[in-house]
Amino acid sequence: MATISQLVRNPRKDKVQKTSVPALEACPQKRGVCTRVYTTTPKKPNSAMRKVARVRLTNGFEVTSYIGGEGHNLQEHSVILIRGGRVKDLPGVRYHTVRGALDTSGVTARRKGRSKYGAKRPKA
């Protein structure tokens, strides 16, 4: 235990918390423009063609964002909204594209978990 005089000379320092989503700069979402839309393969033991986009954000950051759901309408120069949330089997992908916002369409014919994919409620 430190003495009072030691603490007066050298006060205790707060631990600096490191964020897992630095490009958001403490915001819930950020807007950006797609610079490249492509597919990539996940780490072992998984196998798929995961859809991702390279995005230049309004704050100048360039990040890789995962495009969830079946099918998408994104191409180069599409304006999208990204949120935090990594994809465990894609190294370097720390952001998700928000479906149904800006130029990103919602997932068509989605019945369950619709709010996560920007899908409207089906007619009866």
UniProtKB/Swiss-Prot annotation:
UniProt biased composition (Basic residues): 109-124
Family: Belongs to the universal ribosomal protein uS12 family.
Alphabetized SUPFAM superfamilies for the sequence: Nucleic acid-binding proteins (SSF50249)
Keyword Ribonucleoprotein: yes
Chain's role: With S4 and S5 plays an important role in translational accuracy. Interacts with and stabilizes bases of the 16S rRNA that are involved in tRNA selection in the A site and with the mRNA backbone. Located at the interface of the 30S and 50S subunits, it traverses the body of the 30S subunit contacting proteins on the other side and probably holding the rRNA structure together. The combined cluster of proteins S8, S12 and S17 appears to hold together the shoulder and platform of the 30S subunit.
Originating organism: Psychromonas ingrahamii (strain DSM 17664 / CCUG 51855 / 37)
Gene3D superfamilies: Nucleic acid-binding proteins
Ranges where the record places region Disordered: 1-20, 104-124
The entry's keywords: Methylation, Ribonucleoprotein, Ribosomal protein, RNA-binding, rRNA-binding, tRNA-binding
GO molecular function, one term: rRNA binding
Protein name: Small ribosomal subunit protein uS12
GO cellular component: small ribosomal subunit
NCBIfam families (UniProt xref): rpsL_bact
Gene Ontology terms describing biological process: translation
Positions of post-translational 3-methylthioaspartic acid modification: D89
Highest taxon in the source lineage: Bacteria
Subunit structure as annotated in this protein's UniProt entry: Part of the 30S ribosomal subunit. Contacts proteins S8 and S17. May interact with IF1 in the 30S initiation complex.
InterPro entries in the cross-refs: NA-bd_OB-fold, Ribosomal_uS12, Ribosomal_uS12_bac
PANTHER family with a match to the protein in the record: 30S RIBOSOMAL PROTEIN S12 FAMILY MEMBER
